[in-house]
């Protein structure tokens, strides 16, 4: 019996906390715990030191699981039993925490949907006319309005994403040397280029995405203004807006095609100069 006590005493006195590296001699009143499968010097740890270490790992989430950094054994963490009132409150708090992300997503989707509905209604009144637009929406089926109005901004954005100017540019570069009309209007357009420049993806830049969004949403307003300026003799608001939109798209597209072609030629004729030698070198 005395030999077993003599063997156990050195083992107890050799305990060392792997967090603060203190031993039994440093603090004889400290509470020790062996929370994992580790052996040797990392087997023991102070209860208070391990509590602080677990708090750092959980970062305020008391339900998060924490494991030993050496053997990866999960710590067995127990809490005192809760009373019925505290248990119900804790359950409600966890349910609310889990439901909040879904509720936030639903609110976001609902906000976007009703914003699209409002934009669609304003667009109808702007294109058709204020009084005529209200009459059309009052006579329409409510279900049709709830489905049709939010599709207006979606269709505008999808239509804006169609880059028809690029197809025109390809045809321009392919057949410009065969069309004498283009050569007479734009001298030198059919001349061969020394190299083919690399073209960037227009949708790769987030700025291009914002330009597509803003351009699509402001298009009905621009079409209405252009229609009033260029086709004031047309009595129908809808026809005037459609003509204004077509004219705006055609004029803007023509300038954009010409601008891109000039940039293409400028990049094709780019040269890299020799490095200037310093005098006396």
UniProtKB/Swiss-Prot annotation:
Which Enzyme Commission numbers does its entry carry? 2.3.2.27
Which Pfam families does this UniProt record tie to the protein?
Answer: RINGv
Q: Which InterPro entries does the protein's record reference? A: Znf_RING-CH (IPR011016), Znf_RING/FYVE/PHD (IPR013083)
Keywords noted in UniProt: Endoplasmic reticulum, Membrane, Metal-binding, Mitochondrion, Mitochondrion outer membrane, Transferase, Transmembrane, Transmembrane helix, Ubl conjugation pathway, Zinc, Zinc-finger
Q: Which residues cross the membrane?
A: 102-122, 142-162, 212-232, 241-261
Q: Where does Zn(2+) 2 bind?
A: 36, 38, 68, 71
What superkingdom heads the lineage?
A: Eukaryota
Any idea what this protein is called?
A: E3 ubiquitin-protein ligase MARCHF5
- Origin species, per record, is Gallus gallus (Chicken)
